[in-house]
Amino acid sequence: HVVPFTEIQLEINEKCPHDCITIIMRRFMMRIAEQLAKNNNCTALITGENMGQVASQTMQSLYVTNASVSMPVFRPLIGMDKTEIIEIARKIGTFETSILPYEDCCTVFVAKHPKTKPVLQKIIEYEKKLDEDAMIKKAVETTELIIAGK
């Protein structure tokens, strides 16, 4: 699934504290993923997160991210180091794609000093400035499905 996320990023960037935009974007990504999973009769989410690689992957950040969804979230790479992950990527043929240059939400909307220990209640308060339901609905409705190998 390719989810159009730019409008959500712009609104979060405009209405929320800059040091919290990364975690709020992650929470929106999880909510969108959860809705897409439900639409496809899936009962869990799987991510490629690894503990401590970036600010959004601290224990406290993962807790705040998880709190945005009700589905179980599996993170099979959580305890691996970067070398192990690269080795797996090479084995399954995704490494070359993973190193291609591109701009994503983490590079375009990066906070200079992102929160590494976000407080859930504060994040929820910031999110009240956003029309969460409408934003997620639009993103899900305009998602493009790409079948690998076709």
Locations of the language-model features?
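A conserved beta-strand->alpha-helix junction
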Residues: 1-15, 102-104
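Generic beta-strand/beta-sheet core signal
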Residues: 3-6, 47-48, 76, 99-100, ...
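Short, exposed beta-strand "edge-strand" segments with a Pro/Gly-rich flavor and a Y/T-containing core
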Residues: 1-2, 74-80, 112-118
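Active-site adenylate/phosphate-handling loop in enzymes that bind or generate adenylated species
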Residues: 9-10, 15-87, 91-92, 138-144
